[in-house]
Amino acid sequence: MQVSVETTQGLERRLTISVPAEQIEKAVTDSLKNEAKRARIPGFRPGKVPVSVINKRYGKAIRQDITGEVMQRNFIEAIIAEKLNPAGAPTFVAGDTDTENFNFVATFEIYPEVELTGLDAITVEQPTSEVTDADVDTMIETLRKQHATFEAVERESVVGDKAKINFVGSIDGEEFEGGKAEDFELELGSGRMIPGFESGVEGHKAGEEFDIEVTFPEDYHAENLKGKVANFVITLNEVLAANLPEVNDEFAKLFGVTDGGLEALKAEIRKNMGRELEQALKANVKEQVLNGLLEQNNIELPKPLIDGEVEVLRKQAMQRFGDQAANMPELPADLFTEQAERRVKVGLLLGEVIKTNELKAEDDRVQSLIASMASAYEDPSEVVAYYNGNEEMLQNMRNVALEEQAVEALLKTAKLTEKAVNFEEFMNKATQQG
């Protein structure tokens, strides 16, 4: 086998490979003979079909299969010999074949050589926070609202009430699509509607009809409504006031806490909030580290890796639509390209961090991650057993652990400062960004 390597552009490589033609001819002949022994063709006894008949019927397909196998086998031998690391499947083009040699060209992209730079220039502002009694009380209030019951009242509506309304919206006297509803239930103060709508409903009683004027935000999702001033004619059908449950041991039972009452519920809430805070703090630091790593290291990315990541993201996006996905057109690749490029780049850079630091997933860390994740379920031990009994799930957790270790390795050389943050503000921001 003779091999020549050519760098065409960037990460693309072209191998021109020449192998003895007899490799193909012998394999084709052997395959034709074997097929002749197996073939059942009318007019011939089993095992007695002439090779010439088999060649006439199946020769072209057999030769194509053999040629493909020869190209694949010799390509693998060539990249091993030339120490090349393909980032995707090659494209084969069969060349001229003379009496002695079969020539073909394999074109593919390789992984880039990654040399990490600027690791000591990465800056990280590490947030610190804790769950306070006030934070637990705020969560208790949220849970009370989630378990509220509502009853009709004969008074003016206020924030926290639910208002059942009919409304008709118009712009310059013309109704617009989506601007009309009947018996629409709106929680005042929820922020579901555009600015000014909910506050315009406040202070009115059931049975009243009134107009409000609001302006659609400039970033509103409907292009034809952005920045437009609209008038809404509203009929308030019913005002429903919230009845919040009392915070006591009976309240705790609503959440399955039967032993320890209210104090046990608060302890469980604090534990869950603490776990979520820890995860959010780690995610924040990780994001800063990765952003710094990307800023300091610019590498060329193989297109096959980007294309593969686009398909993963596209599939995940379609799954979120559930049963509706079957009737949807394929989402364009452009929607995912930027995110795919980032993920590929992060993967390559972290791979080099792992290689440079000779990192291996720590078993204790893997089990700790599984236990932390399982603690959010009703039966944590069952979840832990499931993960440890499923090699694919276990490998995913090893990858998470290894990524954590790589981030920690980068933190050792990064410029690190601490900043105390308010729990509620930090978690709200983390939720919006997530």
UniProtKB/Swiss-Prot annotation:
Gene Ontology molecular function: peptidyl-prolyl cis-trans isomerase activity; protein folding chaperone; ribosome binding
Reaction(s) catalysed by this chain's protein: [protein]-peptidylproline (omega=180) = [protein]-peptidylproline (omega=0)
Entry GO terms, CC: cytoplasm
Catalytic activity, EC: 5.2.1.8
A Pfam short name: Trigger_N
Subcellular localization(s) per the UniProt record: Cytoplasm
Gene Ontology annotations of biological process type: 'de novo' cotranslational protein folding; cell division; chaperone-mediated protein folding; protein transport; protein unfolding
Enzyme class: isomerase
PPIase FKBP-type domain sequence ranges: 160-245
SUPFAM superfamilies in UniProt: FKBP-like, Triger factor/SurA peptide-binding domain-like, Trigger factor ribosome-binding domain
Family assignment from sequence similarity: Belongs to the FKBP-type PPIase family. Tig subfamily.
Free-text note regarding domains: Consists of 3 domains; the N-terminus binds the ribosome, the middle domain has PPIase activity, while the C-terminus has intrinsic chaperone activity on its own.
Official protein name in the record: Trigger factor
Lineage of origin: Bacteria, Pseudomonadati, Pseudomonadota, Gammaproteobacteria, Alteromonadales
